[in-house]
Structure formats: C-alpha cells, structure tokens
Amino acid sequence: MKSNQERSNECLPPKKREIPATSRSSEEKAPTLPSDNHRVEGTAWLPGNPGGRGHGGGRHGPAGTSVELGLQQGIGLHKALSTGLDYSPPSAPRSVPVATTLPAAYATPQPGTPVSPVQYAHLPHTFQFIGSSQYSGTYASFIPSQLIPPTANPVTSAVASAAGATTPSQRSQLEAYSTLLANMGSLSQTPGHKAEQQQQQQQQQQQQHQHQQQQQQQQQQQQQQHLSRAPGLITPGSPPPAQQNQYVHISSSPQNTGRTASPPAIPVHLHPHQTMIPHTLTLGPPSQVVMQYADSGSHFVPREATKKAESSRLQQAIQAKEVLNGEMEKSRRYGAPSSADLGLGKAGGKSVPHPYESRHVVVHPSPSDYSSRDPSGVRASVMVLPNSNTPAADLEVQQATHREASPSTLNDKSGLHLGKPGHRSYALSPHTVIQTTHSASEPLPVGLPATAFYAGTQPPVIGYLSGQQQAITYAGSLPQHLVIPGTQPLLIPVGSTDMEASGAAPAIVTSSPQFAAVPHTFVTTALPKSENFNPEALVTQAAYPAMVQAQIHLPVVQSVASPAAAPPTLPPYFMKGSIIQLANGELKKVEDLKTEDFIQSAEISNDLKIDSSTVERIEDSHSPGVAVIQFAVGEHRAQVSVEVLVEYPFFVFGQGWSSCCPERTSQLFDLPCSKLSVGDVCISLTLKNLKNGSVKKGQPVDPASVLLKHSKADGLAGSRHRYAEQENGINQGSAQMLSENGELKFPEKMGLPAAPFLTKIEPSKPAATRKRRWSAPESRKLEKSEDEPPLTLPKPSLIPQEVKICIEGRSNVGK
C-alpha cells in the first residue's frame, strides 16, 4: 500500500512531483542531501561564488532550506532575472531584445590578485575611465557591444559578447548570478519538500548554463577579432564607433575587506550629451554608455525610457534585488531607486569602506531629445561626494530626479541618501555634476595618474550641463559653464564652440536677476570629507534650481560668467541688476554706482587707486559700430587711442555711465546711460602693486608707461579681444605695442572686451598696474569704485605722483 506522501505525489503534475533519490542521476544526488554543505555544492560550480560565501548563504536557513528556495516566489522570477542579466541560453528568443546590452566580462576573480591587461573596444576618442583608485583592488571593464559588427545576428552577438575565452571571463560573467542565488538562498526561511523540487530545477538551470558556456567558448574567437588592445585608455585617434551601447564596469575591492564575491550589478544607461567637458569624462555622439559601479556592493539601477523590453527587464531585475535585500516595495514607481538599489549589501550589517560612491543619471543626447524620449522632461542630477579613507567616514550620495512623482528619502547604514526631487520648472534644463577627489599621486583604475585625465591639481570633476532650452535675451548670451574648485579654480564653458578654461574663483554670481532663475550656473566647492550632507539642501528648494552647490560666497564676487563666444558682444556685467561689491563689502547694483563709491573704495583699500583719463577726441572707425576714442591719461596726460564698440559704457566722473551710443547701450543692457563727449573724465579702479597693465598677460610696461587695464569681462572672456598699444609720440618714453586679449584697461572704464582696442600710449606715465582679479562684473565695479580721481579731479590727495593710466576706464565700472 502506498504511503500518503506517494499518493499525494502522484496527484501532482509531473514537474511538481518529488523524484526519489534512487531514481536520480549520480550528479544530482549530492545537492539534494539535507546537509548544508551538500546543498550549497549546487552553486559551487559557479566560479565567482567562493565556497565560504556559498556556505554562509546556505546556513542562513533552517534544515531543508535550499539555495533556490528564494525562487519559490515563482519560477518566472528566476527566469526573468536570468533574462534581465542576459544569462539565458543563446537559443532563447527572449535574449534578442537585449542583445546589444549584454556586457562581456573580463575580470580577475579575487580582489587581491593583480589586474591583467584589459581589452577594450573602439570607443569615442574622448571616452575615459574614471573610477575609484585609492585601493589596489581588482578593476574590470566591460565594453562588449561596440565589438559586435552591426550586421551580426542579435542572438549570436549576445552570445559572443557574453562569452569568455578564459576561466576568469566565465567567472566574472556568472559572478553576479551566483551571488544572487546565494543571497536569495540566505533569505529563504521556509523548509519543506519544495526545496528539493526547486533544487532539482536549479540543477537543470546549472546544466543549461554549463552547456551555454561550452558554446560561448567556441564563439569567443569571433569576438576576439573585433577586440583592440589599449594600455588602459582609448587613444584619441580611435575611430568613432557606430551607434551602439557601451558598457563600463568599475569595481573596487579594498584589500582590507573580506568581500569574497561581487554582488550582482545591474547595467545603468547614460545618454551622453555632445557638449561634455573636454578634459574629463567625454562621451561620443549618439552612443549609449552603461556605467556599472560595483564598489563594495553598491548597486545602481537607473531609469531607462528607450525600449519596452529593456524597461521590463530592468524592472524584473529591480524586483529581484528587492527580494535579495529582503525589502519589497511593490508600490514604488519604476525609476525611483529603493533602499536595495541605494544601499550596500546588508548581510553583515556593516558597510565596507570604499573611495567614493556615485549615483547614475539618465541624460539624453540633446535638448530636443527630451521631448521625444521623455515627454515629461524627467531629469536627474548626480553628485558624487568623496569618501574619506576611514570606514567611519560618512559618505552620502544625492540623486535628484526632477520628477513630480512621490519619492522616498532613504537613509541606510551605508550613509547613502536619496534626495527628494524638487519640482522642476519645465522651461529649465537639467544639470549633472559628478565630483571625485583623486589626487595627482593616486593611480586611477587603469593605472594612469590623475593628471592624465585632469589638468593641474584641481579635484577631478565630471561635469555635464545640458543645452539651454530657454534662450537668453541679452547680447552675448552667458554660456553655461562649470567651475572646478581648487588652488587655481577653472571655469569651463559648456556648450560653446570655444571650450577654453580661464582662472576664476569657485563662486558664481549670475549677472542679473533676469538670469538668477537660469539653472545653468553651477558652483561646486570642495566639501569636508566628514561633512554630512542633507540631500534636500542640495536639491532645488524652489521651482528654479539656479544653483546647486555646497556653498556660495556672495561677498566673493568673482565674475565667472564668460561673455558670449562671438567677439562683437559685450560682457554681461554691464547688464542692469548686476551686483558689484565695493571695497567696504557693500553690494550695489551696477546702475546705482556713483562717483563717491569709486572714491570711497580707493580711500578704504590699500591696494586700489583711482585712475582717470580725459576724452579728447571721438571719431568713427572704419568698422561699423566701432568708435575711436583718444584719451589723455593721468597727470602726464599720456595720449591713448582706443577702438571701442559704440555701446560700450564708461563711467564718467560726476556723471555716471556714458557711451558713444546711449540708445544701443540701453537697448542691450537696460543700463541708464549718457552721451560720452569730449572733455568727460572717465575713472576706474586699478591695483597699486601691479607693474603691468595686465595681470594675466603681463604687459611689458615701464614705470613711465601707462597702465593698461582691461575690462573684467575681457579677462574672464578668455582674452578674445586684441589690444594694441602704440606710442602716440606726444610724450617722451617708448611705447609698447601689445596685442592681448581682454587684458587692457581703459581710462574711461574697464577695457572693451568684445572689440579690439588700438591704444596709443605715451609711456611717460609711471608703472601701470592692472587689476586682473576684478574680471568679474561685480568685482570690476568694485575696482572702479576705488579708482583714483583723474588729474582734473579736485582730489589730488588720491593721485600719487605715479598715477597709472587705466585705459579700461569704464569697463571696471561696467562690472
């Protein structure tokens, strides 16, 4: 008579029946034993899963629990995850939609072993690997689909890209899968005969994967033909690839950690913009880049809005990760990372130290793509904050998803924070700033020093600012730019054809209230490693994320706004509403500056003095819209001729702003302006301790020569304007012929930044000094406020014997 168990077993479908141990093949008997060690042997074949990790996963559950018990939620979950990770057999049709997104693995299995040369594909010539470098752990790079020819069969491409010729390749390929099984087994708590049934299914899965690996090894030769070897960085001469997906996997394993296997890392998609910072992470035209950061178990699952198949694939993977971490958020929206996505593996309840952590962002190639790819205009902001070398340091990563969905602010043991998305203004563009803190001496993952990627000693910043969707209406639109803080901060304009960096202070002040709402200005200041960040403070607090930064110093009014790329345009600091800081720290609008402000600043400051010049002649130039003004500069009345745009404003003593064409000045800058006429005395502030008229260019001016001071806009603009000094012959002394960009200062105001100046100087003047640091519009105004009165001024005490000639004149005030 049959037992109850046998009878109930017969009632079950064939696949659900319990197969007696005696009827199983010899290779299946071992895993079905109730012993923990034997139960876990089923996953021992997976090279990426060391025995200790596997056994630990098996012992978490009571007797009878199997590694596959976590899959009792449904076999579909296991298969969906396998599909999401693209570990399905090559014959499976479900691998076709994701054929171009399967990463090929090249990694060493253990964290302590040295890294062998990695094979890379032909990437865009500006592509660079950026990753953690404070530890000599294992680093791997996954760049498969660029290697696959466009005409390759999708299934064949998927298999070829996943195949590995060596055992380490296979290990790293299945490492995530094996770890997932182990972790899911550790979460299993329900013993019973179903465990044995699912163990049986696990064995079938293992056999399928083993068979798959054999086929992949045979096809590996095809892939090797498309691989090109590089010392670690794609050379600039590499031809740009076709539009395909790029995968980069950067993982770090500190030597002092006991992590034995890398947790599963889900691919993350980035759509690069064409106007990336040139000397940092720059991605090619229309290709996609998938960044995988597996540092100490950190997983990042982003939002992908391109394909339905990929979307569902990632959704399944996210669900699997939620199960893996023991946390289910059934109601959460796709794209809003859960604590499982944000946090480290919580198995040990202790986060592993690692150099830095990052969040990923979905960025579309161009602003026009936003409407087609993401109608709701979803954006993401990313900031990677540095982590100190000590495990106790608090590292926090903010991700602001400008989505109106209800987000969740999570804070787990790893110190990761998900910032609440601010309500975005649909007319504004997103911004992404990624900052790391590699020192020049720290080796990067590919073995190159930090200086190979970043110029100077500034902390590396991967910055991206998308194109402005809302046109700026003033002449010489202020291009978006990125400030890299450091000992000598860099201002990097983004989106401009002239990608040149000019020295600037790490503070940005928008030139007028009109632009205060434009979120294209970023200030990234170096943050203390131990400082705790509140993500809500960094994320936009209002509808206009004008500035996302750690801190901004308004009193330090350094002009970081560069003028328009077109030379004939004027700098924005003349715009009505621009803030100028006086020597006493007072802030005034540019249109409110008075002569007393200049005199008071010169009296208060020990470094500034007022230079003056008298207009002697105003003539039309051969070029349209340009006037030639002749000045008598200083007490020696050195003759200087300057070519200036007719709308360029100068500050006249006792009168205020004046220009050759007040109508155009008012039209462009909305700045109240008077007509500049012969006899007007233009004043500006200059530095006493400068020997050369230009701090930046270092003009060779003798003590008897005049001070050539350029407008702040000129210095900041990157010296786009050429100024030539010619001796007028009226005075004694030799005149120097100078051709410098934005370096000259004119007595009226600061030099005209947008138009070339021809200055005829009588070098009978004392050594000229130019204030280069006042390049900012606000700072320039400060300079002007400190300008010394000209010879004609009734304040001779301010005019030393060696009065310097400031040809810039009004450009200082124009700030």
Swiss-Prot record:
Result after altering K529R: Sumoylation reduced to 57% of wild-type
Effect of K16R: Sumoylation reduced to 40% of wild-type
Region spans: Interaction with USP7: 538-815
A molecular function GO annotation: DNA binding
Domain of life: Eukaryota
Residues annotated with Phosphoserine modification: S82, S88, S238, S253, S775
Post-translational modification: Ubiquitinated by UBE3A, leading to its degradation by the proteasome. The presence of expanded poly-Gln repeats in spinocerebellar ataxia 1 (SCA1) patients impairs ubiquitination and degradation, leading to accumulation of ATXN1 in neurons and subsequent toxicity.
Domain AXH residues, every copy: 562-693
Keywords in alphabetical order: Cytoplasm, DNA-binding, Isopeptide bond, Neurodegeneration, Nucleus, Phosphoprotein, Repressor, RNA-binding, Spinocerebellar ataxia, Transcription, Transcription regulation, Ubl conjugation
Stated name of the protein: Ataxin-1
Organism: Homo sapiens (Human)
